[in-house]
């Protein structure tokens, strides 16, 4: 039995119905987990002596606009004892109703969830530390969302340099 098969067997026996589906891509297994069961799954993966996923290496989020559910939250786990990586994916329909915080399982999750909220706007229930981490406190919106308005400065070339130069706010004496 492979390690991936062992993970699925343990999850299926201990938490029936928690796993929605699985996918393999480039040698990495992704397990799609129900949002209401993800905390139980994470605790089991960490505490089971055969699995020992003791390291949460990252939490990320994807925006699938215009698809529904729009957001996916990804938990990247590492079992150092078994030298094995695993990704859990949770679908999130409403970013204000995201999954529960994992901070009581892995303390680093507080910061990782803060990053996901700052850039993508997905809230984690029970995380009282959600605040701006990378962006200024007065920033409006979440810039990694697909519907975030793009802003840019026009590139200056030889054919348009006078037009661009005239728009720049140079210091006045």
Give the label of every model feature segment:
Residues 1-173:
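Terminal low-complexity/charged segments
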């Amino acid at each position: 039995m492979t390690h991936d098969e062992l993970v699925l067997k343990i999850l299926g026996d201990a938490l029936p119905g928690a796993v929605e589906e699985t996918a393999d891509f480039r040698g990495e297994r992704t397990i799609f987990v129900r949002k209401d069961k993800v905390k139980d799954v994470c605790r089991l993966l960490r505490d089971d002596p055969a699995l020992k996923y003791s390291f949460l290496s990252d939490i990320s989020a994807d925006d699938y606009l215009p698809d529904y559910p729009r957001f996916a939250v990804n938990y990247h786990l590492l079992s150092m004892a078994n030298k094995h990586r695993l990704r859990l994916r949770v679908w999130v329909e409403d970013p204000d109703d995201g999954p529960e915080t994992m901070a009581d399982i892995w303390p680093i999750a507080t910061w990782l969830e803060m990053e996901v909220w700052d850039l993508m706007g997905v809230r984690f229930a029970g995380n009282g530390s959600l605040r701006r981490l990378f962006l200024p406190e007065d920033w409006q919106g979440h810039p990694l969302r697909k519907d975030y308005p793009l802003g840019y400065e026009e590139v200056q070339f030889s054919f348009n340099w006078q037009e661009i130069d005239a728009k720049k706010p140079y210091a006045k004496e």
